[in-house]
Amino acid sequence: MLLTNAELVDGRTVDLRIDGEQIGAIEPTLDPRDDERVIDADNRLLLPGAIDAHVHFREPGDPHKETWATGSRSAAAGGVTTVIDMPNTTPPTTTGEAFDAKGDAARAACIEYGINGGVSGDWEPDSLFDRPLCALGEVFLADSTGDMGVAPDDFEAAVERAVDEGVTITVHAEDETLFDDNARNADAGGAGRDANADLWSTYRTAAAEAAAVEYATEVGQETGADIHIAHTSTPEGIDAAVDGEATCEVCPHHLYLSRDDLDELGTYGRMNPPLREEDRREAVFERVADGAVDIVATDHAPHTREEKETGLWDAPSGVPGVETMLPLLLNSARQGELSYDRVVDLVAHNPADIFDLDSKGRIEPGYDADLVLVDPDNPQAIHDDDIHSKSGWTPFEGRHGVFPELTLVRGQVIYERTPGDGRGRGEDDEQFSDVDGQNVRA
C-alpha cells in the first residue's frame, strides 16, 4: 500500500509505503508499484495510531456493557489502534487461568491489545507472571469497580514482585481514609441525571488522591519500581507523581469536564476518581500541555444507560471514552490549546515508551503501520447515537472532535469513513474490516 501526499506533524508532506505489516519507506515522493493500492491523503494529517493505555473492555464477565468486538470497533473509529486492558473483569485477571480466559475473549478485537495482570489478596503471581503481561495493574489502593482494593502490605509485596519480573505497575491512587464520610451519608436526590452527583466529588477528595500518589511513589523509589499513576485528576496528584519520579496519565473526562458539568450529567458523570473543580481542571490541562503529564488515556469504563439511571450511591462508576480521546485532543490542537506534536507524544510516543511497545507509536521505517488519517479542518459534533461502544452514550455529547477518516493496524485498513454532506458523523459512510487483532506481547 502507498499513501501519497500525507502531512506529518513535523510539517513535511510525504509519500509512505507499507510493506507487509510495517512502514517500509517515507520519502518526498515514491513511485507506485504494480498492483499496489494507492491512497491519496490529499494533504490531510497522518498520525501514528493512538495507544489507549487504560481500558476496561468488560469481557469476560459483563458482555452486556462491552465486548472486545464492540470496544475495539469504537477504538478504531476514534483512531486508537492499541489498547491495554485492566484486570477488574469477572473473573479478575489475577491468575494465569483468568489471563488465558481473557486472552481467548480478546481474539475478537480488530485492533492490537495488551492484557494487564491484577493484584488481590488471593492472586497467583507465579502463574500470572508466566503469561505475557503488558503491565501489572491497575493495582487499586482504594475500592472501585470490581472490589479489588489491596492493603498496603499486599501492595508493597506486589511491587517487589513486579520489580523482580521487570514489569511496570499501574496504580489507582486514592486513600480511602481521606474520603469524606459526611458527604457519603448525605441525600443525593433523584436518579440518573436528576441525582446530586456533586456529592461524589465531595466524597472522594482531592487530598485522598495526592496522599495515595505520594505513598505509591515512595514505595516505588524505595524498591526501584517503575510506577505509573493512573487517571490523575488533580494538579496536586500530578505534582506528587512528578516529585516521586513516576509517570502519570490524565483522562479526557478530567481534561474536558468539571464539577460544573454534573448538574447536567448526574450519575453519568460518576467515575473514580471524580470530576474536580473548574480551577483544578484548568490546572490539569496546563500540566498536560506543558509536559508534566506523560500520557492521556481514557479509563474507558462503559455501563448501560439502565445501570446509570439509578441513584448516586447505587450507580456504577465509569464512562466510555475510547472513541473520543484522540478526536477531542485533536480539536484542542486545532484550536491552539495543544500542539499536534504534544498530542502525538501523549497518545503514541510516550505510552509506547512507558509500556515497552517497541514497534508502536512512531511513523518511521520499521515500525508497525498503525496509522490514522484525519482532516483537522473538519471537526464534527459528538453525539450519543454515533458512538460505537455497546454502552451507546458519551459524557461529551455536543462537544466537537476531529475524527479519523482512515485507521490502519499493521498495514490493514480496519476503519474507513467517507465524510458526507456535513450533517454529522452519523450520516457518513463508514466501513469496518474484519481483521483479527493481536496481543502486543505475543
Predicted features along the sequence, with ranges:
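Histidine-rich, glycine-flanked metal-binding segment
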Residues: 1-48
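Metal-associated gating/positioning segment near the N- to mid-region
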Residues: 44-108
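Histidine-centered catalytic micro-motifs
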Residues: 50-60, 169-175, 298
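Divalent metal-binding segments
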Residues: 56-64, 84-97, 117-123, 139-151, ...
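A glycine-rich helix N-cap at a beta->alpha junction
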Residues: 103-120
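Histidine/acidic residue-rich metal-binding segments in metalloenzymes
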Residues: 123, 127-139, 144-296
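His/Asp/Glu-enriched, well-ordered alpha-helical/loop segment
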Residues: 198-224, 295-296, 301-376
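C-terminal cap of metal-dependent C-N hydrolases
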Residues: 368-442
